[in-house]
């Protein structure tokens, strides 16, 4: 599963990405070899979106959703917007749960 994390500059999202990687690595149910993560600034989304399975949007760019949706909709990529509290705690476990829920919903709507 390729998970793309997107924020204003890609720096703080890298810390969240590392937390998500630890969750996958420490999980008994998930195989870390089947996951790839990448943190990018929103300005690079168009060039990075292909082959993405889920998009994680940082709270600092939630207001750009109207710009983001037209980029990801042709690829049918499920997305989550991380709330400020979860983001501030760098809570990778909660974000991974959000990603899995978004993926399930997307599969049910196919």
Task: Go through the PLM ranges and name each one.
Residues 2-44, 51:
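Conserved active-site segments centered on acidic
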Residues 9, 60-62:
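Short glycine-rich anion-binding loops that position phosphate/pyrophosphate groups of nucleotides
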């Amino acid at each position: 599963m390729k998970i793309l994390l997107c924020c204003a500059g890609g720096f703080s999202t890298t810390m969240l990405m590392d937390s998500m990687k630890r969750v996958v690595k420490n999980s008994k149910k998930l195989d870390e070899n089947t996951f790839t993560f990448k943190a990018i600034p929103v300005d690079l989304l168009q060039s990075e979106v292909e082959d993405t399975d889920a998009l994680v949007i940082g709270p600092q760019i939630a207001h750009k959703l109207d710009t983001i949706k037209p980029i990801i909709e042709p690829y049918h990529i499920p997305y989550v917007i991380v709330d400020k509290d979860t983001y501030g705690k760098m809570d990778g476990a909660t974000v991974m749960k959000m990603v899995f829920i978004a993926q399930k919903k997307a599969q049910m709507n196919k």
